[in-house]
Amino acid sequence: MRNIFKRNQEPIVAPATTTATMPIGPVDNSTESGGAGESQEDMFAKLKEKLFNEINKIPLPPWALIAIAVVAGLLLLTCCFCICKKCCCKKKKNKKEKGKGMKNAMNMKDMKGGQDDDDAETGLTEGEGEGEEEKEPENLGKLQFSLDYDFQANQLTVGVLQAAELPALDMGGTSDPYVKVFLLPDKKKKYETKVHRKTLNPAFNETFTFKVPYQELGGKTLVMAIYDFDRFSKHDIIGEVKVPMNTVDLGQPIEEWRDLQGGEKEEPEKLGDICTSLRYVPTAGKLTVCILEAKNLKKMDVGGLSDPYVKIHLMQNGKRLKKKKTTVKKKTLNPYFNESFSFEIPFEQIQKVQVVVTVLDYDKLGKNEAIGKIFVGSNATGTELRHWSDMLANPRRPIAQWHSLKPEEEVDALLGKNK
């Protein structure tokens, strides 16, 4: 028993582990770290050597390469500086405008007794626009006129008295004004005053009458438009006065001044078209003009039709040498004539003459009114000149072509200019 007790008192020894014991003290890693450092230095040296090799291959001296690098650096710095400056200025401007707008908004709110946010926004908008100059309305002059309505005769009398302070549209610092008077919307009757030469303060003193029932007068607008007459081109509008008749008390005569307003350019009135044929035989010295037909002529009669016929004048240097005319076609705006007329013109004179074609409305009782006019010749323009040139380029062959009719005064002015 004693032996057993002694055996149990023997100390218990732990079994040995298989793991190796770590040495006590600092670990020497100098070998590994030294190897890594050497490899990085080698790589850097190789890259440096490669870079210098590439630079040496460039066919430029070292100072040139340095200069290029300096210039590139300066450009880069300049670009960065400009971008920064622009951004700073923009922020500063936005901040300033915002502060100014808020200040104006607050002022507007104080003046109006504390309005809502919409009023503050309006103040901001007005504050931003303070620097902009307001465009002054153009001064076109003024017109004095009179109105008088005869209730028994259902007749409106319009007096065009005078104009003042008109703008100068001619080269000499003046204008040649006249007035067109008509009622909208129909424009059935259009009057014109006489042209007053070289003046900016014309005295017209002319009256015009319109037969209009009083019940219909309220739906009409009186227009008095002042134009500058030009003999050789389209007349320019100076300004106009519009008077809605439903705004006027016609119980007594009216006389007043009104400022001229900018008027819309008047579209050229469509007068219709005419088809003519030209044929010239140089050896015989014979010019044949055939009036074939016309279409879409202007309505001249009360019934909405016309009684058209055509006059042909052979002219030279502004003088009428010969005259011919067609028969009258009754009550039509699209007459068919097919009538030919011959003129004896030597070849050496053919470039010196003009053929003037006028379409007129026949009136049994009164004067025959011209609907429109054209002329062909070597001094014509547009389709008229082309027609004449085609005729001369194709002797003995009839050449037909359509022409748009023009106002009589416009063609007469061109003929006078070409004398």
From Swiss-Prot:
Q: What positions are modified (Phosphotyrosine)?
A: 227
Q: Write out the tissue specificity statement of the associated record.
A: Expressed at the neuromuscular junction. Expressed in melanocytes.
Could you tell me which residue ranges the C2 domain spans? 139-258, 270-403
What does the note accompanying the cofactor annotation read? Binds 3 Ca(2+) ions per subunit. The ions are bound to the C2 domains.
Region spans: Phospholipid binding: 133-379
Membrane topology category: Single-pass membrane protein
Alphabetized, the UniProt keywords read:
Calcium, Congenital myasthenic syndrome, Cytoplasm, Cytoplasmic vesicle, Differentiation, Disease variant, Glycoprotein, Membrane, Metal-binding, Phosphoprotein, Repeat, Synapse, Transmembrane, Transmembrane helix
What are the GO BP annotations of this UniProt entry? calcium-dependent activation of synaptic vesicle fusion; cell differentiation; positive regulation of dendrite extension; regulation of calcium ion-dependent exocytosis; regulation of synaptic vesicle exocytosis; vesicle-mediated transport
**Positions that bind Ca(2+) 2:** 169-170, 228, 230, 236
The record's region (Disordered) falls at 16-39, 99-138
The chain residues annotated with the modification Phosphothreonine are 122, 125, 199, 383
User: Binding residues for Ca(2+) 3, per the UniProt record?
Assistant: 230, 233-234, 236
Q: Where in the cell is it found?
A: Cytoplasmic vesicle, Secretory vesicle, Synaptic vesicle membrane; Cytoplasmic vesicle, Secretory vesicle, Chromaffin granule membrane; Cytoplasm
The record lists the membrane-crossing segments as 63-83
> Where does this protein hold Ca(2+) 4?
301, 307, 361, 363
| Acidic residues bias locations | 116-136
- Family designation: Belongs to the synaptotagmin family.
This protein's name? Synaptotagmin-2
